[in-house]
Amino acid sequence: MNRSLNSANFPHLFFAGRTRLTLRNNEKGTHIRLKVVQKKTRIEGKLVGTNRFYLYTSILNDGDTGWDFAATFFQDSKNYSLGKEHTQGSHIHKVVHFIQRALREPAVLDAMGAALFHEGKCCRCGMGLTHPASIMLGIGPDCIKSMPPSFITDLITVIA
């Protein structure tokens, strides 16, 4: 049950913490599912998010199985380190490079004919979304308070 998202919010949703997104190639009718999990570390007994985000990909529609570790992304630079199982020039490398381009300039998604969807769960905490406004944004009402101010600023420009 995928719900469409505005591609301008892609970087914010990608780095939200527990994101599951689908990128669909409208021209070819193909898709790839993305699962992004923030690396956390324990500081003084409390789990704190780090700058690293692990990207898993799945091209199958088989629920929670079939995820393959693709890369580690770094939020500040939007650079990535490709997973050890993948080589330069491989299909996954091309996908990860496209994601990097989309993180730096979200308009690339629309220009390349890619549509962005989420699975009905909050991209920050992973809980199911029920409120219509939350479903439209991909972030729950409590989690939106934790998003950076730029998320709200970008939303205003997108909605207006």
What residues fall within each predicted segment?
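Short metal-binding segments enriched for Cys and/or His
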Residues: 147-159
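Short, flexible, mixed-charge glycine/proline-rich loop motifs
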Residues: 108-119, 130-134
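General detector of N-terminal leader/presequence modules that precede the first folded domain
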Residues: 1-51
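Interaction interfaces in information-processing and related assembly proteins
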Residues: 31-95
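Short Cys/His-rich "knuckle" micro-motifs
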Residues: 130-136, 150-153
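Cysteine-rich micro-motifs
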Residues: 135-146
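Short cysteine-rich clusters marking metal-coordination/redox-active sites
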Residues: 122-125
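Short, surface-exposed polybasic-aromatic patches that bind anionic ligands, especially phosphate groups
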Residues: 85-94, 104-114, 157
